[in-house]
A protein has these predicted regions:
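Catalytic binding pocket for nucleotide-activated donors in carbohydrate/polymer assembly enzymes
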Residues: 59-60, 67-204, 208-213, 218, ...
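Short acidic alpha-helix that forms the nucleotide-activated donor recognition element
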Residues: 52-60
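Conserved helix-loop functional segments at active or binding sites
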Residues: 29-33, 63, 70
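Residue-level marker for well-ordered alpha-helical positions
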Residues: 25, 51-52, 76-77
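Conserved catalytic-core segment of nucleotide-activated headgroup transferases in glycan assembly
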Residues: 3-44
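Short, flexible loop segments at the rims of nucleotide/cofactor-binding pockets, characterized by
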Residues: 42-44, 66-69
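Single conserved hydrophobic/aromatic residue that forms the stacking wall/gate
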Residues: 1-5, 9, 229-236
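Catalytic cores of eukaryotic secretory-pathway lumenal/extracellular enzymes that build
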Residues: 43-52
Length: 236
């Protein structure tokens, strides 16, 4: 209390994250109030996400979207839990998605986006410009501009929506626009494949069967043999 150096000041770290949540809640209201769309689509923001909520979501999921920018995800376990419950992954080559892809094969996963190496190269060269993509891609421009459209502004807060729009066009640190078109194409492919129930069931079974690789027994054994110590060292 007596040290001025320990004072904590307000920072901007989570402003964009809150703007994204605000965008989702605004879209939620927009979809809910549209009589032509509401019967076919629903957006739900799960608040206070915890284990109890996860126990309902994991078994119910058909497509697990793990869409972090390649090189940004260390390795979560959510995708493994979805996989064990039969969900098919749609994601980037990042985190445990890399191992899932190797296990199930390209026919049983939907991979999109730039590689980690390419993304890191963009950061090193500082040559990524979201505005160039925005101004030269009609579909991307239309989608980004929808954030600040009359329909959205009528339901949401102008400050939040305009700030998020500006972030995507002027900075886009996580290179959202870079992978956008590839994501849309893979999502469309996944939804089309989902319509073939027999083929989709096979994809689900492959994912369930291959999920055993992520068991704690196998993981602990590997840590023991490769990272912590070997049996020979233990004997010594």
């Amino acid at each position: 209390k007596s040290s001025a150096a320990s004072d904590v000041y307000k920072r901007q770290a989570y402003v964009i994250a809150k703007d994204i949540i605000h965008l989702l809640l605004t879209l939620q209201d927009l979809i809910k109030d549209d009589p032509e769309v509401a019967p076919y689509m629903k957006l739900v923001m799960v608040e206070n996400y915890n284990v109890s909520a996860a126990e309902k979501l994991f078994p119910a999921c058909d497509i697990s979207e793990q869409i972090s920018l390649a090189s940004k995800e260390a390795s979560g376990t959510g995708n493994m839990k979805f996989m064990l419950n039969g969900a098919v992954t749609l994601g980037t080559m990042d985190g445990a998605n890399v191992e899932i892809s190797e296990l199930v094969g390209e026919d049983n996963i939907y991979i999109f986006g730039e590689s980690s190496e390419k993304v890191i190269e963009h950061y090193e060269k500082a040559d990524y410009c979201s505005r160039d993509i925005y101004e030269n891609d009609k579909r991307i421009k239309e989608c980004v501009d929808f954030i600040v459209s009359e329909k959205m502004l009528a339901l949401g807060h102008k400050e939040n929506l305009e700030r998020l729009h500006h972030e995507l066009v002027s900075k886009d640190w996580f290179m959202t626009l870079l992978d956008f078109n590839d994501y849309v194409e893979k999502k469309d492919q996944a939804l089309a494949d989902y319509a073939d129930r027999k083929t989709w069931a096979k994809k689900m079974l492959v994912n369930i069967a291959k999920a055993g690789f992520f068991s704690s027994d196998r993981t602990i054994e590997q840590y023991n043999n490769c990272l912590l110590y070997t049996s020979d060292a233990a004997d010594d």
